[in-house]
């Protein structure tokens, strides 16, 4: 990168930004096609501003010019750790730390800019205060968002920082001061209250239970609808909603029964948001497309309905009754992942091809020939495939309900992903069941915490294969599972297949004791590594 117009300290190679033109020239030459190099350059740029800050107005203008390229670069780097299983590898952990540190650094830069802007008599001063506080709210929220996307626990103090920036906006009287936002794709204005509400809505959406894709959709909707929510102080004797924000607590929106200092409470008026949610759900029921009603073009009607159903209670501050009561528990659960391992744990034996399709290698036949006198001529040919199945990981049971568990584990063990299929032997049982990871987070100590929900029915380990069709090629069987119907919860009989197998009306062959052909009906449940599908017997 050319450094024309820039200077460096004589005793170091540290970059110095002497004026607005030099800073703009530096930013105009960012190699955005190379996000890694752009990250280095932006860090150098922010370090320069923090160590040798220019005049306040110049400082603010330069920071504003970084918003679009900065968010682009960090989004590209986030691809290294977003949607990856836990615990993260070294490359993923390093990328995460880099992105979070940049958000912290730019927040410090805006805060420093505010300290340098001492011209309180300037009529534009309130606008600059509002702008700085909004950006501090935005970038602190990005720290929270990155932790959600990486499924990491929020560090201590981050929520207090966010509350502090919003409280400052209230004190200055600029909480709803309209501000331009270069990051808004529709050119809409925003304000500090909306930025703060967006973070609170994200938090109560249950981000650790959402896929990364759904987190992105929820974040977009929260940004879009946050201006509909207003924040008010707690008046003496006033009835409060079930949830409120305590500005002195290091958490987001929470039950007010836990808050004693009402002077620091802030309540959210979500009545307008509730009306919009009701209207949008009605419009979807009337067959309007998500794009037509402003929900975006990246989600289907069914997907939007499910996500809106998930958000309806928390975003309107209605207490959600648990479908199954959670009870404290203790003990060690055994957990296995991957179809090969799960099949072994559930069946109790290694998987082998059924006799009708079994094929033997030259080594197998050589072994049989050498030891043919030792074989029972009446016995079926048995050749061990030599696969080595890993031992199950051990997880500590924290609590349980009728359909699942909350488990925790140290950092040691196999990687695990949100939505993944697991075979679990409960602490109080002796048989493995199938379950899906529905909630996943890495805590501050590095350990993993997971919520898992059991699939309905007792699984039976079976074999399945695709039919050869017109190719004439014999297909080998692979591991799968059969789940019986559970009438009590209206769960039909189903198959659990590797991801990618389902096609509507596809005919496959399953094998337990004899081969049976079945026609796949529709997907009941899925994840990154499996599909649970209903089926009917092929006539």
Locations of the language-model features?
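Long, leucine/valine-rich, helix-dominated scaffolding and oligomerization segments
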Residues: 2-201
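Serine/threonine-rich low-complexity intrinsically disordered regions
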Residues: 19, 38-41, 74, 87, ...
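Extended, domain-scale alpha-helical bundle/helix-rich regions
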Residues: 175-361
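Short strand-loop-strand
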Residues: 317, 321-430, 439-444, 449-459, ...
């Amino acid at each position: 990168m050319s450094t024309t117009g820039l200077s460096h300290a004589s005793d170091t190679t540290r970059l110095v930004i002497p004026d607005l033109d030099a800073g703009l020239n530096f930013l105009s030459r960012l190699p955005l096609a190379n996000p890694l190099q752009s990250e280095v350059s932006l860090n150098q740029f922010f370090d320069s501003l923090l160590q040798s800050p220019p005049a306040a107005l110049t400082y603010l203008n330069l920071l504003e010019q970084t918003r679009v390229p900065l968010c682009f670069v960090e989004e590209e780097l986030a691809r290294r750790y977003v949607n990856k299983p836990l615990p993260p590898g070294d490359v993923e952990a390093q990328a995460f730390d880099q992105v979070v540190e940049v958000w912290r650094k730019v927040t410090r830069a805006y805060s420093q800019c505010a300290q340098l802007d001492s011209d309180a008599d300037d009529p534009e001063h309130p606008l600059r205060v509002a702008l700085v506080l909004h950006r501090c709210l935005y970038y602190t929220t990005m720290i929270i968002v990155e932790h959600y996307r990486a499924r990491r626990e929020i560090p201590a103090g981050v929520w207090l920082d966010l509350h502090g920036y919003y409280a400052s906006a209230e004190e200055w009287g600029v909480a709803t001061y309209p501000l331009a936002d270069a990051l808004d794709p529709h050119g809409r204005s925003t304000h500090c209250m909306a930025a703060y509400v967006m973070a609170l809505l994200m938090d109560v959406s249950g981000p650790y239970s959402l896929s990364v894709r759904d987190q992105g959709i929820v974040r977009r909707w929260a940004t879009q609808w946050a201006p509909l929510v207003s924040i008010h102080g707690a008046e003496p004797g006033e009835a409060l909603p079930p949830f409120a924000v305590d500005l002195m607590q290091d958490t987001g929106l929470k039950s007010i029964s836990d808050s004693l200092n009402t002077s620091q409470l802030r309540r959210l008026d979500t009545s307008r948001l509730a009306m919009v949610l009701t209207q949008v759900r009605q419009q979807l029921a009337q067959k309007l497309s998500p794009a037509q009603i402003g929900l975006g073009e990246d989600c289907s009607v069914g997907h939007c309905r499910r996500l809106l159903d998930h958000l309806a209670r928390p975003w309107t501050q209605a207490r959600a009754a648990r479908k199954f009561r959670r009870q404290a528990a203790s003990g060690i659960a055994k957990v296995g992942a991957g179809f090969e391992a799960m099949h072994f744990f559930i069946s109790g034996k290694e998987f082998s091809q059924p006799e009708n399709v079994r094929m033997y290698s030259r080594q197998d036949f050589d072994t049989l020939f050498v030891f043919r006198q030792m074989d029972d001529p009446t016995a079926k040919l048995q050749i061990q495939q030599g696969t080595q199945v890993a031992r199950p990981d051990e997880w500590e049971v924290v609590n349980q309900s009728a359909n699942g568990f909350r488990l925790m584990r140290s950092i040691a063990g196999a990687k695990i992903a949100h939505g993944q299929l697991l075979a679990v032997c409960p602490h109080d049982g002796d048989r493995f069941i199938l379950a899906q990871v529905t909630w996943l987070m890495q805590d501050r100590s590095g350990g993993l915490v997971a919520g898992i929900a059991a699939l309905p029915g007792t699984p039976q380990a079976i074999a399945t294969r695709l039919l050869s069709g017109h190719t004439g090629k014999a297909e080998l069987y692979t591991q799968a599972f059969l789940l019986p119907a559970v009438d009590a919860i209206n769960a039909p009989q189903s198959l659990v297949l590797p991801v990618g197998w389902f096609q509507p009306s596809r005919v496959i062959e399953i094998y337990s004791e004899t081969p049976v052909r079945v026609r796949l009906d529709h997907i009941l449940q899925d994840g990154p590594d499996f599909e649970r599908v209903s089926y009917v017997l092929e006539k």
